C-alpha cells in the first residue's frame, strides 16, 4: 500500500504541533507501508528524512518538497499556498491521501477528484475558530476558509485530535456526516523525552541564554500567534512573584503587528519585574528536552487549542502543566 501525506510542515521546517504530528506519523506508517510526504518549503535532502524506527521496516519513506511558484512569490499568502497545492495534487500517486491543516487540504481535495483516491484529513485546527488569521491573510482568510470547508465536506474520513475538536468540526461544518468524523488523540514517543545525561550537550542551552538552574522557573513554548495566548501571559506575569524565573520559547510570529505587540509587552514586563528570558529561535530537540527537564512548571495560556502536543511533551518530562481549559486541553492535562 502507498500513502501520500500532505503537510505544510515537515523537517527541517517544523514550527508547530502539526509538523511534529506529520513527522512522527510518517515514521511509524513507514514501518508498515510505503509513505511519500509531500511538503511545503522547498526540496529536502537525504539528511532531512527521519529514520524509520524498528529493525525490519516493511515500508519506505520518501520526502518531496515544493516551492511557491515564482509567479506567485509576491501574492497573498493563501494564493501562495494554492500554488503549492496545485503542484502537489498533480504529483499525488497513492492508494490513500492523508492531508494535514488547511494549507494542504486543497491539495488533498483536488488530488482526490483528479486521481479518484480516498482522502483522509486530520484536523489540527479550524479556520472558523481562528478569526485572527485575517490579520495574517487579509482577504486570503476567505480563501483558506473556503478551501478547508470544501475539503472537509468531501473527505472520506476526518480525524479529530480530541473529542472537543470533533464537536468543533461538526459545529463548523454541519453538512459533514458525523459518522465520517472520528477521534484519534495525538500522542508522543516517550523515549524522546527521557532525562538527559549530565554531560548531554543539550544542557548548554542554560548557559547560552543565562538561565539560572537554581531558580524556580516557569516555561512557555509556542508560536507568537493569537491562538497561543502569549500577550495574555505577559500581562498575567506582572502578578507573579518576581523571584520566579520565566523562560519564553516563542518565535515564528504570524504578523509583524503581533510581534511588535509582544516586544512591547515583554519590554514593559522586563522593566517591572525582570527575571524573564525570551528565546526566539526554534531550539533543537536535545536543547528543548534539557530545558523542559530543567524547569519547574509549564504554562499553556492558549485561547484555542484542539489538543496541545506541547502539554504532552512537558508532562513526559515530569513538568506540572498549568493550562487554560479550552479545546482538547482538559482531555490530556491530568
Model-predicted segments: where are they?
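A conserved mid-protein helix/loop that constitutes part of the nucleotide-sugar donor-binding site
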Residues: 20, 216-220, 225-239
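Aromatic "clamp/platform" in nucleotide-sugar-dependent glycosyltransferases that forms part
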Residues: 303
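N-terminal subdomain of nucleotide-sugar transferases
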Residues: 1-52
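Nucleotide-activated donor-binding/catalytic signature segment of Leloir-type glycosyltransferases, i.e.
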Residues: 250, 259-282, 286
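Nucleotide-sugar donor phosphate/pyrophosphate-binding loop at the beta->alpha transition
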Residues: 117-118, 128-150, 167
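Short hydrophobic beta-strand element within catalytic cores of glycosyltransferases
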Residues: 320-323, 333
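Short alpha-helical donor nucleotide-sugar binding micro-motif in glycosyltransferases
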Residues: 289-295
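Carbohydrate-associated surface elements
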Residues: 164, 187
Amino acid at each position: 500500500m502507498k500513502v501520500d501525506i500532505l503537510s505544510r510542515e515537515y523537517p527541517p521546517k517544523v514550527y508547530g504541533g502539526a509538523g511534529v504530528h506529520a513527522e512522527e506519523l510518517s515514521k511509524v506508517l513507514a514501518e508498515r507501508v510505503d509513505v511519500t510526504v509531500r511538503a511545503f518549503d522547498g526540496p529536502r535532502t537525504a539528511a532531512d528524512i527521519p529514520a524509520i524506527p524498528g529493525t525490519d521496516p516493511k515500508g519506505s519513506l520518501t520526502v518531496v518538497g515544493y516551492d511557491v511558484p515564482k509567479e506567485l512569490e509576491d501574492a497573498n499568502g493563501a494564493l501562495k499556498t494554492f500554488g503549492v497545492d496545485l503542484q502537489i495534487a498533480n504529483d499525488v500517486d497513492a492508494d490513500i491521501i492523508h492531508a494535514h491543516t488547511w494549507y494542504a487540504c486543497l491539495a488533498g481535495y483536488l488530488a482526490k477528484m483528479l486521481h479518484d483516491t480516498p482522502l483522509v484529513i486530520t484536523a489540527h485546527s479550524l479556520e472558523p475558530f481562528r478569526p485572527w488569521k485575517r490579520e495574517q491573510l487579509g482577504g486570503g482568510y476567505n480563501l483558506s476558509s473556503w478551501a478547508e470547508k470544501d475539503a472537509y465536506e468531501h473527505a472520506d474520513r476526518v480525524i479529530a485530535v480530541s473529542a472537543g475538536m470533533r464537536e468543533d468540526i461538526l459545529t463548523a461544518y454541519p453538512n459533514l456526516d458525523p459518522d465520517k468524523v472520528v477521534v484519534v488523540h495525538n500522542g508522543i514517543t516517550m523515549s524522546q523525552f527521557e532525562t538527559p545525561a549530565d554531560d548531554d550537550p543539550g544542557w548548554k542551552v542554560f548557559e547560552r541564554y543565562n538561565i539560572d538552574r537554581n531558580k524556580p522557573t516557569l516555561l512557555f513554548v509556542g508560536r507568537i500567534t493569537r491562538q497561543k495566548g502569549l500577550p495574555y501571559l505577559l500581562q498575567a506575569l506582572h502578578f507573579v512573584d518576581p523571584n520566579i524565573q520565566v523562560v519564553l520559547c516563542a518565535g515564528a510570529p504570524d504578523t509583524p503587528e503581533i510581534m511588535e505587540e509582544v516586544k512591547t509587552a515583554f519590554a514593559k514586563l522586563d522593566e517591572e519585574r525582570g527575571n524573564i528570558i525570551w528565546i526566539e529561535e526554534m531550539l533543537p530537540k536535545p536543547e528543548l528536552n534539557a530545558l523542559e527537564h530543567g524547569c519547574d512548571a509549564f504554562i499553556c495560556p492558549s485561547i484555542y487549542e484542539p489538543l496541545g502536543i506541547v502539554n504532552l511533551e512537558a508532562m513526559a518530562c515530569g513538568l506540572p502543566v498549568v493550562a487554560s481549559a479550552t479545546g482538547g486541553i482538559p482531555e490530556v492535562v491530568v
